[in-house]
Regions:
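Penicillin-binding protein/beta-lactamase superfamily catalytic region
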Residues: 203-250, 281
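Short Gly/Pro-enriched turn/cap motifs at secondary-structure boundaries
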Residues: 50-53, 156, 269-273
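Active-site-adjacent helix/loop patches that line small-molecule binding or acyl-intermediate pockets
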Residues: 2, 14-41, 103-213, 220, ...
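Beta-lactamase-like hydrolase cores
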Residues: 2-5, 14-78
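Short acidic-glycine loop/turn motifs at beta-strand connectors
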Residues: 64-68, 96, 221, 284-290
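Structured C-terminal helix/loop/strand segments within mature extracytoplasmic catalytic/sensor domains
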Residues: 232-373
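Active-site SXXK
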Residues: 81-98, 117
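Short glycine-rich loop/turn motifs
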Residues: 56-61, 192, 277-280
Length: 373
C-alpha cells in the first residue's frame, strides 16, 4: 500500500476546510510569540541518580507583590491561563451567585476529579431541565477508585461546576445562554473586564484560544498571571471566592490533588488553583507583602504533579507555610534549582528537604562500586 504523506487524510486539498491545516509540521513563526527553543524556559527541578543529572524539569516562575513583579525566573514566557483562571471567570458573577451554598460556590471554581460529591455539587447549580444547556465535553472521572466509570458524561468533566455556575449566572443576569462558551458572548467580555482590573484597561491578549472545556482562554506572560493572582489577596474580603475555596478544598480539586492539599496546608492564608498543562497559581496573604503576593508556576512540558509539588513546597516553605513532600521517589533524588525564589530566601531554601526519612535510597549502592580493570 502506498501512502502519500503530501495529502491530508481527512480533508483533501481544495476541499472546504483544507486551508485550516498548518502549512508545515514545523509550525509557523509569528513575530512576538516565541516557540520551541526560543521560549525562555528555566530549569526548576533536577532529578539525579547517584549525583548525575538524569531528568531536568524546565518551566517558569514569577512572583508579584501587588502590581509589581518582584522576581522572575522565566516570567516572560507566554502561555494560556487555562483553568487556573476560574476564580476570575466567576468574579463576573459574584453578586448573582452570592446566595449559593458554600459547596456550590466552591465547585464553581473547581477543576474537580469527578467524584460523586463533585458531580452532586455541580448538578445542584441547575434545575434538571437546564442540564442540556451545558456544553462541557463528554468525559469520565479524572481519578477513579474501585468500580470504573466507562460511560462518559458531561458532569464528569473537570469543568462541569464552572459551566453550571456560568449558566446559572447568565440566567440571573438575564443573558442569553445560547453560545455562552463563545468569545462573542457577554461572559467573555465580563471575564476580560476582570482581567483588566489587574493589568490595566488597555491590556489586550496576543491570542485567544479555545480551552479544553470549550470556554475561551487568553494568552498571558507568567509574570502577568502572577500580578493577577496577587489581586486575589486584595479581593479576599470583597467577595466569596477566597472563603469558598478555603472552606471546601476537596471540592476545588479532590483527593491528593496539589491545589486541594495546599489549600489545607495554608489554613486560610493561601489560595491555590491548578491549570491544565502545568500551571499552578498561588495567592498568598503574608505580612511581608501587604499588597498581596501572587506566585505562578508553569511547567514547560505540561502537567507534572510531582515536580510542581516540589516547587510549591519550596516556595511555600521559604514563606513559612509547611506543605508536605509528594509521595516518595523510588528512582532518582529531586533537587530544587535556587532561581525559583528571590535571593533573600536562598538560605531558608537550603533547609527544606525534598526527601523524607522513609524514602528508599535506591539510586546507588552504599559502598564504592568500581569497575575492575
Amino acid at each position: 500500500m502506498n501512502i502519500n504523506h503530501h495529502e491530508h487524510s481527512a480533508v483533501k486539498p481544495g476541499r472546504p476546510g483544507s486551508e485550516l491545516f498548518p502549512n508545515s509540521p514545523l509550525g509557523e513563526q509569528v513575530e512576538g510569540i516565541p516557540t520551541g527553543r526560543d521560549v525562555a524556559w528555566e530549569p526548576l527541578v533536577d532529578y539525579r541518580r547517584n549525583g548525575v543529572s538524569e531528568t531536568t524539569i524546565h518551566g517558569a516562575v514569577a512572583w508579584a507583590h501587588g502590581d509589581e513583579v518582584i522576581h522572575s525566573f522565566g516570567g516572560n514566557v507566554l502561555c494560556y491561563g487555562r483553568s487556573m483562571m476560574k476564580p476570575f471567570m466567576l468574579k463576573a458573577f459574584v453578586e448573582e451567585l452570592a446566595n449559593l451554598s458554600w459547596e456550590q460556590k466552591a465547585i464553581s471554581v473547581a477543576s474537580h476529579n469527578g467524584d460523586t460529591e463533585h458531580v452532586a455539587a455541580a448538578q445542584s447549580l441547575l434545575s434538571e431541565s437546564e442540564w442540556p444547556l451545558m456544553l462541557t465535553p463528554l468525559d469520565v472521572p479524572l481519578i477513579q477508585f474501585g468500580r470504573q466509570v466507562r460511560r462518559p458524561r458531561r458532569w464528569y468533566h473537570t469543568c462541569s461546576g464552572e459551566h453550571a455556575a456560568i449558566l446559572r449566572g447568565c440566567r440571573e443576569k438575564g443573558w442569553n445562554r445560547a453560545g455562552y462558551t463563545l468569545p462573542s458572548h457577554q461572559v467573555f467580555d465580563a471575564y476580560m473586564s476582570q482581567i483588566r482590573r489587574f493589568l490595566g484597561e488597555d491590556w489586550k491578549p496576543l491570542r485567544i484560544a479555545k480551552d479544553g472545556c470549550g470556554l475561551p482562554t487568553v494568552s498571558n506572560t507568567v509574570a502577568e498571571l502572577a500580578q493577577i493572582y496577587a489581586g486575589l489577596v486584595r479581593d479576599k474580603d470583597a467577595d466569596w471566592i477566597w472563603e469558598s475555596m478555603v472552606r471546601h478544598p476537596d471540592l476545588v480539586g479532590g483527593f491528593n490533588r496539589l491545589d486541594s492539599t495546599i489549600l489545607k496546608a495554608g489554613e486560610g492564608t493561601v489560595i491555590a488553583k491548578e491549570g491544565a498543562d502545568g500551571l499552578l497559581g498561588l495567592a498568598i496573604e503574608h505580612p511581608d507583602y501587604p499588597k498581596g503576593l501572587g506566585i505562578v508556576v508553569k511547567i514547560a512540558h505540561g502537567w507534572n504533579a510531582q515536580a510542581t509539588w516540589y516547587v510549591a513546597r519550596a516556595i511555600l516553605g521559604v514563606l513559612g507555610i509547611d506543605l508536605r513532600n509528594p509521595y516518595p521517589l523510588h528512582r532518582q533524588k529531586a533537587f530544587i534549582v535556587p532561581g525559583i525564589v528571590p535571593d533573600r530566601y536562598l538560605n531558608v531554601l537550603e533547609t527544606i528537604p525534598t526527601w523524607d526519612e522513609w524514602d528508599p535510597d535506591q539510586d546507588r549502592w552504599m559502598y564504592d562500586a568500581e569497575l575492575e580493570s
